[in-house]
Design a protein with these regions (language model features):
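Short, intrinsically disordered low-complexity segments
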Residues: 159, 168-169, 183, 190, ...
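Cysteine-rich micro-motifs
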Residues: 168-180
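Cys/His-rich metal-chelating microdomains
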Residues: 156-161, 177, 182
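Short helix-coil boundary/hinge micro-motifs
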Residues: 1-152, 159-160, 194-207
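Basic DNA-binding region of bZIP-type proteins
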Residues: 178-195
Length: 207
């Protein structure tokens, strides 16, 4: 799923909140950080489901931005270590410390049509939302079943880590519609590219 915010499309196809946060740093080298200003972070938190849709996060500032980037880096190091069979104790210590705080307080409220919907008992602070993401990382990293489905995307120029819940766990890409489709297009082009030679010189294919 993607949601447009300015010129950037958020993607939430990694399967977990903490993985989606880590994926915001998974661009190609030299690309701009999508979490480059407070309003982008506020939008991401809402779209990612860290708070109920429609929640106003007017208190998000540069301090929040720094702290969420630090958490993102720690989660990314933990994921890389997990996939490589290594330890990342410094990153683990940071995530555990953030997870120890209380997450946002949830409550059920009446919507306009009378249905109960998820709401918040108080306006969430930075520490509470960091705790929500950090606790998701702790839950993931201590769940043997989930860990068995942890994968690194095989797409070109993509390093997203995702949760493979497909039958047989044979999924190769973070998103079949994005990285998977790119691979299929590239494979099609390779199959139909005319071999180099005199005929190729007469009519070069469109780029």
């Amino acid at each position: 799923m993607a949601t447009r915010k300015g010129s950037y499309d958020w993607r939430f196809d990694s399967g977990r909140l903490c993985l989606d946060l880590a994926a915001t740093a998974a661009g190609s080298p030299g690309t701009a950080d999508p979490l480059d200003r407070p309003e982008r972070l506020a939008d991401w938190l809402v779209r990612a489901g860290a708070v109920p849709l429609g929640t106003r996060l007017d208190g998000v500032d540069d301090h929040w931005l720094v702290r969420f980037r630090q958490l993102r880096s720690a989660v990314d190091r933990l994921l890389t270590a997990q996939l490589g069979g290594r330890a990342a104790d410094g990153a683990l210590e940071r995530v555990n410390a953030l997870a120890a705080a209380a997450p946002p307080g949830l409550c059920a409220v009446r919507a306009g049509n009378g249905a109960l919907v998820r709401g918040l008992s108080t306006e969430p602070g930075c520490g509470a939302l960091l705790a929500a993401v950090a606790r998701d990382a702790v839950d993931l990293l201590t769940d043997p079943v989930a860990l068995a489905g942890l994968r690194r995307c095989e797409g070109d120029n993509c390093r997203r880590v995702y949760l493979d819940t497909s039958r047989g766990r044979r999924r190769r890409w973070c998103s079949s519609e994005v990285c998977g489709n790119r691979e299929r297009v590239a494979r099609h082009r390779r199959r139909h590219t005319e071999p180099a030679g005199p005929s190729a010189d007469r009519e070069a294919p469109d780029p």
